[in-house]
Amino acid sequence: MALAAELIRAPSVTPHADDALELVAKRLEAAGYRVERLTFETGGVPIPNLYARIGTDGPNLCFAGHVDVVPEGDATQWHHAPFAGTVEDGVLHGRGAVDMKGAVAAFLAAALAFGRPQRGSLSFLITGDEEGPALDGTVKVVEWLKARGETIDHCVLGEPTNPDALGDAFKVGRRGSLSGILTVKGVQGHVAYPHLADNPIPRLLKLIGDLTAAPLDHGSDFFPPSNLEVVSVDVGNPVFNLIPAQATARFNVRFNDLFSLESLKSEIIRRLDGAGLTYDLAFQTGASQSFLTAPGPFTDLVASAVEEVTGRRPEPSTSGGTSDARFIKDICPVVEFGLVGRTMHKVDEATPVKDIEALTAIYGRIIARYFSTFA
C-alpha cells in the first residue's frame, strides 16, 4: 500500500509519467532486475516505458500495466487532494488508485517477495502511454521485444476487472473495435427551391437504417453479440433555410470472435450496397481484432488464485472496452485481473487498502503456482 500511495504522489497525467515509472524502475533494479528504459516519440512527445526481467531462461511470466493516469478534472470537487495519496479509514484516495497504480504496486510487492525464480523468469512491461493515444506505449514495447527475440510465455495485465467486489471477474479476451465514417453527398440549395437542390439526409437515413436493421450476430460461446452504434449524424448546418451539401454519420462496432476485421468490413459494405445508393465510406485507423485466451491451465491457475484469496471463483469475461491486452496477445496468452473499477476515471477515485493487500496475495499465488506448473 505504501508504494501505491507513493506512486499516486508522483503525478503522471498522460503522457508525463517519467517520475512514477522511475519509482518502479529503481525498486526493480535494487531487487536484481535488468531494467530497460525505453522511450518512443512517434506522436511528437517522448513517452517513457520500461521492460524489466529477472532470470534468463523460460518460462517468462510478465506483469503488464501502466502508470499514466487521466487528468483529475476540477480538483476542488475532490474530497481528498487527487495526488496526495491519502489513506483515511482504510481507504487509499487519489488519481490512479484503481487505474492502475494500485495493481502495479501489488504485483511489484508480490514479485519482490517471491524473489528470483529457481527456473524461469519474471518480467514487467510498464508504460506511460495507455490512457492517451497509445501510440508509443505497449505496442512499441511489443515491437521492441519481437525485434530482439525476447520471449514472454504468459502475461497478467492489471486492469481493474471487477465490477463490484474483488474476485467478481477476470478478462480472458476483448472484443474488437472498428470505426467508420459514412458520407452521402448532395447539392446545396434553398429550402424554398428543393427542385434546385439534392438533400442528402434522407439517403443517409436510409443507409443507416439498412446498416442497423438486423443484428450482426447473436454472440458466441465467450462473447456477447457484436454491436454497431451510430454515434453522430452531422450536416454542418446551423440554419433552417439551407439544404446541406452533404451528410455524414460516424459509427463504431464492438465485435466478437465470429468476425475478423476484413469479414466485418465486408458485411458492412454488403448492407450499405443493398440500399442501392451512392455513398462514401472510410474505415478509421486504429481498429483492433477481437481475441480470446482459451480456457486451460493458465486461466485455471489465475482463477484458482483469486478464489483462494477472495472465496469466490471469478467469472471469465470479455466485456468492456479495449486495453493494452490487444497488443500483448500478439506475443503470448494474456489475462487481466486487477482492482474494483467503480471509481476509475472519476472524481474521488479510491480503493480499500484491504483490496490492495488481497490483490498482492492473489498475485503472489499466481507467481508461485505459475512456476510450479510451467517451469
UniProtKB/Swiss-Prot annotation:
Required cofactor names: Zn(2+); Co(2+)
UniProt cross-references to PROSITE patterns, sorted A to Z: ARGE_DAPE_CPG2_2
Keyword Amino-acid biosynthesis tagged: yes
Pfam families hit by this protein: M20_dimer, Peptidase_M20
Pathway(s) it belongs to: Amino-acid biosynthesis; L-lysine biosynthesis via DAP pathway; LL-2,6-diaminopimelate from (S)-tetrahydrodipicolinate (succinylase route): step 3/3
Binding site for Zn(2+) 2: D99, E131, H345
Organism: Xanthobacter autotrophicus (strain ATCC BAA-1158 / Py2)
Protein name per the record: Succinyl-diaminopimelate desuccinylase
EC number of the protein: 3.5.1.18
